[in-house]
Swiss-Prot record:
This is Pre-mRNA-splicing factor cwc2. It comes from Aspergillus fumigatus (strain ATCC MYA-4609 / CBS 101355 / FGSC A1100 / Af293) (Neosartorya fumigata). Residues 55-68 have a biased composition (Basic residues). Residues 34-51 have a biased composition (Polar residues). The gene is cwc2. Involved in the first step of pre-mRNA splicing. Required for cell growth and cell cycle control. Plays a role in the levels of the U1, U4, U5 and U6 snRNAs and the maintenance of the U4/U6 snRNA complex. May provide the link between the 'nineteen complex' NTC spliceosome protein complex and the spliceosome through the U6 snRNA. Associates predominantly with U6 snRNAs in assembled active spliceosomes. Binds directly to the internal stem-loop (ISL) domain of the U6 snRNA and to the pre-mRNA intron near the 5' splice site during the activation and catalytic phases of the spliceosome cycle. SUPFAM superfamilies: CCCH zinc finger (SSF90229), RNA-binding domain, RBD (SSF54928). GO terms for molecular function: pre-mRNA binding; U6 snRNA binding; zinc ion binding.
Length: 414
C-alpha cells in the first residue's frame, strides 16, 4: 500500500487556516466570489509506492484573502459633543469658540484605537470597484463595517494612483497648507515627508521611530533631532505618507506620549534640494524610457553593442564619414517601424495577373494630342461620340495688331 508524506519546503512558513466562517456567528459568511486570491504557495508531496520507489510531486495551494474584520464594535460608538471650552458652539466645525484660549498641545487626547495591518486588512466591497479610495476610519483604527465597507482596507501601493487634487482617502486638497501644516495638504507640490513631534526622548529614538512608521509603507529616509524629540520621516510614495499621517495622529510610540504629526515644510538644506531635483530627473528619465522603443533606449545607454555597430554602418546614409544626429536617426528608425506596423495591419495588395484590354475609344485616339483650337483632340473625339459625329471645330482667330501697327513717332528718340 502506498504511503504519502508531505514535506514542507525550507522557505515555507507555517500554513494558516482558511477563514471559513465569520468570527461573529450571526454575521454573513464570506462568499467565494468576493474572495481575492493571494499568491499561491507550494508544498512538496512525497509518495512511496509498493515497490519502495519514492516520487516527489509539487502541489500548489491557493489561499484566499480573508475579509476585513470590524475594528470596533458598532454598539460602542457614541457621538458625544465636545466639552464646553468657550461661549459659542459652532455647529459647522463641531467645537466651541470664544472664552479662554486653551493650549492646543496639552488639550490633545490620545487616539482611542490604532490600526493593525496584519490583523485588520482584508477585502471589502471596494475591491470590486476600480479607482476606489482608502478608508479613513480604517487608517485610524475605528472602522466598524469590516468587509462591508465601501472603501479599501489595506495599505497603498505604487499602483494606486489618484488625481493630484485629492489624497488617497478622496478628500480635496487645497492650494496652500494650513498655518499649522495639518489637514489634507496642498496640491501645489508632492509632499512625502512627515513632521513628528512630542516624541519621548531616549537614546534609541531613531530605531523606535523607524519601527513604528515602517508599518505604513517603505521609508526613504529618517532624520531625527534627538535633543528636541522631533523626527522627519520621508516615504517613497506620497499615498503612504498620507496614510501614515492619519494612522499615527495622536498615537504613542513606546511610551505614553501623544504624537503631533504634521506635514513637513520645504527643507532649506541645499543637499536635500539637490536630492529632490535628482529624484524628479530620475522620474522624468523613467517616463522617457517608457515612451521610447526599447532598442533605442538600449542604444543610448550603451547596453547594446550590436545597435552601435548598426548605427555606425547605417547611420551614414551612404555618405562616407557622416554621422547622423540622434534625432535624425531616431526619426528614421521610427519611420521604418511605423511602416512595418502599417504593413502588418493592412492586407497586402494583390497584383492582377491579366491586364485589362484598352477600350476601343481610347485605342482610336492618336497617341499625341495637338491643340488645334479651343478644345483638344481628345475632347473633340468625346463630343463626336456623344453627338453622333456632327461636331465641327474652328481654329481660334489670330488677334490683329489693331491701329497701332506700324505706328511711327515724329520724335527723334525712335
Amino acid at each position: 500500500m502506498a504511503e504519502t508524506a508531505v514535506i514542507d519546503p525550507p522557505h515555507a512558513t507555517e500554513p494558516t487556516s482558511l477563514p471559513t466562517e465569520s468570527a461573529d456567528p450571526s454575521g454573513p459568511a464570506p462568499s467565494d466570489e468576493n474572495a481575492l486570491t493571494q499568491p499561491s504557495e507550494s508544498a512538496v508531496t512525497a509518495t512511496t509506492d509498493a515497490d519502495g520507489t519514492q516520487k516527489k510531486t509539487k502541489k500548489i495551494i491557493r489561499r484566499k484573502r480573508r475579509p476585513a474584520r470590524p475594528q470596533v464594535d458598532p454598539a460602542t460608538l457614541k457621538s458625544e459633543p465636545p466639552p464646553q471650552t468657550g461661549t459659542v458652539f459652532n455647529i459647522w466645525y463641531n467645537k466651541w469658540s470664544g472664552g479662554d484660549r486653551e493650549d492646543k498641545y496639552l488639550s490633545k487626547h490620545a487616539a482611542p484605537s490604532r490600526c493593525n495591518i496584519a490583523k485588520d486588512s482584508g477585502y471589502t466591497r471596494a475591491d470590486k470597484v476600480p479607482g476606489s479610495y482608502f478608508c479613513l476610519f480604517f487608517a485610524r483604527g475605528v472602522c466598524p463595517k469590516g468587509h462591508e465597507c465601501e472603501y479599501l482596507h489595506r495599505l497603498p501601493t505604487l499602483h494606486d494612483l489618484f488625481n493630484p487634487n485629492v489624497d488617497c482617502f478622496g478628500r480635496d486638497k487645497f492650494s496652500d497648507y494650513r498655518d499649522d501644516m495639518g489637514g489634507v495638504g496642498s496640491f501645489t507640490r508632492q509632499n512625502r515627508t512627515l513632521y513628528v513631534g512630542r516624541i519621548h526622548v531616549t537614546d534609541d529614538i531613531e530605531e523606535v521611530v523607524s519601527r513604528h512608521f515602517a508599518e505604513w509603507g517603505q521609508i526613504d529616509r529618517i532624520r531625527v533631532l534627538t535633543s528636541r524629540g522631533v523626527a522627519f520621516v520621508t516615504y517613497t510614495n506620497e499615498a503612504n505618507a498620507q496614510f501614515a499621517k492619519e494612522a499615527m495622529a495622536h498615537q504613542s510610540l513606546d511610551h505614553n506620549e501623544i504624537l503631533n504629526v504634521r506635514w513637513a515644510t520645504v527643507d532649506p538644506n541645499p543637499l536635500a534640494q539637490k536630492r529632490e531635483a535628482r529624484r524628479l530627473e530620475e522620474q522624468a528619465a523613467e517616463a522617457v524610457r517608457r515612451a521610447l522603443p526599447a532598442e533605442f533606449v538600449a542604444e543610448l545607454e550603451g547596453r547594446d553593442p550590436e545597435a552601435r555597430k548598426k548605427k555606425k554602418i547605417e547611420g551614414s546614409f551612404g555618405l562616407e564619414g557622416y554621422e547622423a544626429p540622434d534625432d535624425v536617426w531616431y526619426a528614421r528608425t521610427k519611420e521604418l517601424e511605423d511602416a512595418r506596423k502599417a504593413g502588418q495591419l493592412e492586407a497586402p495588395e494583390q497584383h492582377l495577373m491579366i491586364e485589362p484590354a484598352p477600350s476601343s475609344s481610347s485605342a482610336a485616339l492618336p497617341s499625341q494630342s495637338e491643340d488645334t483650337g479651343i478644345f483638344s483632340n481628345s475632347t473633340v473625339a468625346a463630343l463626336r461620340g456623344l453627338a453622333g459625329g456632327n461636331v465641327t471645330t474652328q481654329k481660334a482667330p489670330v488677334n490683329s495688331g489693331g491701329p497701332l501697327v506700324a505706328y511711327g513717332s515724329d520724335d527723334d528718340s525712335d
